[in-house]
Amino acid sequence: SERAWRMAGSKMFVELGSQIKVEDLIRGVIIQSGNDACIVLAEAISGSEQQFAELLNDTGKRIGLTNSTFRNSTGWPDPEHKMTARDLSILARRIISDFPEYFPYYNERSFRYNNISQDNRNPILARVPGADGMKTGHTEDAGYGLVGTAKRGDRRVIMVVNGLPTM
């Protein structure tokens, strides 16, 4: 959509009117933090980003997110859009357990789409032994955040850090 194509912030550089594999969009969201990819997926799943946010809120309640409110698919600033560190950890655990087929994407170091290669923004992947995912985020208001995961032996560790001045 034109809305996805014009979206500011991080992008995977989806071209207006192009056809894209769902797998590429998912990788664009996970690896590149592509706001454009988020919107394309939201519109495909629910018809509009607003309807997708409603789906996120309903699903969040169902899986035990008690202090989160979604207003968009990207995390773009909105006074009512919020998520606690605890809810982020619950969501991370559910993604890992419910969608294991997508978890390897969180450990990919880079993704190339439309002849543009972008590195994964997760700094712990290259620095922490056993680190294997998850996701970074940033807004001017909230600062930098990270949901990091690592596996040591049989133990999975999920770490949530929010409000950092730098990553």
Each model region followed by its residue ranges:
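Active-site-adjacent loops and short helices of periplasmic peptidoglycan-processing enzymes
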Residues: S1-R86, I96
